[in-house]
Amino acid sequence: MKVLSTEYRVPGTEYRLPSSEFRVPSSARTVLRALSVLLLTVLPASLAVSTALAQDSVIVIDPDAPVSDSTEHGALPPEILSELLEDYNDSLSIRLPGGITVPRGSMLGGKIAAFRGSVHVAGTIEGSLTVINGDLVVDSGGVIHGDVLVAGGGMTVAPGGVQEGEARVYWDAAPVYREADGTLALRERRRSVGELATAQRTFATGKVKTTLRLTTGQTYNRIEGLAIVFGPAFEYRPSHNIFTRLDARGILRTAGNSSPFRDDFGYSVRGDIRFNAPRGFGIGGRVYSEIRGIEEHTLPKDEIGWSAFLLQRDNRDYFDAQGIVGSLYFFPSRRLRIEANVRHEWEGSVRATDPWSLLRNSEIWRPNPLIDDGHYNSAGIGIEYDTRNSQNATTRGWWIRGGVERGTSDDVAPVTLPTAVRDPIPTHSYEYTRLTLDLRRYNRLSADDRLNLRLWAGGWLGGDPLPVQRRLSLGGLDLVPGYEFRAETCAPAGYADPADAALCDRAIFTQAEFRHRLPIRFGYTYHDKNNRELDRFLGIDEVYLVLLGDAGKSWLTGDGPGRVPNNRIPSLDEWKADLGVGADAGWVGVYLAKAVTDGEPVRFFIRLERRF
């Protein structure tokens, strides 16, 4: 096969494969776009119906059933983790290996615990049963006289099976591992790449807990290079219902800088006081001088950093922000947070510097675009609703974030943009309003299958046109990875901008991925000849096959050629869409994506975190 073009990319960017002449017929493009959007609403409902119809013949305790059922919800609570460890590690417990069957006619008695693998009960168990990271199946004729606790799996009682006593089922896997003596212990949470270079020490003096921290800014970019963050944090609890915190951080920017537009040192000092935790309300305030990213809903900071450090590809733009913000937030429930804030800050342009990169170090970094400099006053309200069972390894739940911001300025110094993008904005009495919404749904279909869905929308809502630092684009491996970085910027034809700035008023995109756990393990298993319970595995023990689809559009809003009316979104036949496949091992994922609405090449990319 003749290679037409190749581009080497790293984590956080993409590898371009040989160009392809394949194009999806235009008659099919609208259908593919519609399916991408329809998938967000139709598929979850159809799956729920099919699941219900398939369960007529057996009793299944479903952890996602309504609250009225005998079902536990939410993340695996700490008290349940403690109970699991206590049950399994009890010297009086009978420990069963995973994948065992209690045969018909046999009987086990006492306190019984099993780790990893399904437990089938066709005989009789007299006593309590704990199953950790496995399923429990009570076959026809099987009887359990006692309480049951299942974590990391489901429980099925076939017709003719009996379970007497309390039954508690959590589909969330227990983060535990087997130690050399056969007991279980809690596994430390896997740290993200950005947290690896972190050192901290925590100690307490009376009611005050102090944490000293030295870390990076969890990124590397063409403005700061590697930012070193350091400073103390103090926590004080004068009573059970009052929590206070003061966090002071200095920021040292290591990239050389001869520009007067950026200091080598920044800071952030934040204070919070919260009442009636975890429910109740709180008051917070922060003063800061920091480099802030534009379009921060795209790639995480650590993946941006690795791409910049390794291949001199910084897929984000930045500006200098110095100011003060005050906030008032409420927790009507453990899952819901509502916040109102007011802010006064200086926002200024910054130039790209020339930090070192491992590869392509002799090349020139992409320029950082100019922004609309000025002092801005803003007021905003934000809502976050989070029912995820885990923040680090989510398998089910909702995560919804949204906000409205109204900003004003009396001394803005605007960048001159083509009139096709925006008319000149006023330098006095300038005001705008913008909206953002990020809606995510995680579904656990079975022990091995997941379906994750996302809808993001944002942009101009009212007032004058948005400032450059609030504008949007589409394209790149975090949004629609079948397309190159900033495939849509809303720049008019013939407009040359080496910074490739995002200029769109609004953007919307949808993402869907189906994840299936593969029976693949990479690594080494240490076998204990005398006790199977002491077997240990080192390596990658979980790999997911990922099928993905994305669709989205960014545009200019208003009246006139090339614009979409304010009360409408673009028709689906104008959206860009892609399909892809990949493998995710948790700490790294490799993917292939192909645009289905344009003749783009197949793109290969690597992610260091889940897509969303």
How should these model regions be labeled?
Residues 4-33:
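Arg/Gly-rich low-complexity intrinsically disordered repeat tracts
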Residues 33-48:
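Bacterial N-terminal signal peptides
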Residues 72-91, 97-99, 103-104, 152, ...:
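Outer-membrane beta-barrel initiation region
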Residues 99-101, 107-108, 118-121, 125-127, ...:
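Extracellular beta-strand scaffolds
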Residues 236-240, 275-279, 330-334, 387-389, ...:
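Outer-membrane beta-barrel strand-turn architecture
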Residues 245-251, 284-288, 339-343, 401-405, ...:
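Transmembrane beta-strands of outer-membrane beta-barrel proteins
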Residues 258-260, 282-327, 360-539, 549, ...:
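C-terminal outer-membrane beta-barrel translocator/porin domains of Gram-negative envelope proteins
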Residues 380-383, 580-581, 585-588, 601-612:
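Outer-membrane beta-barrel "beta-signal"
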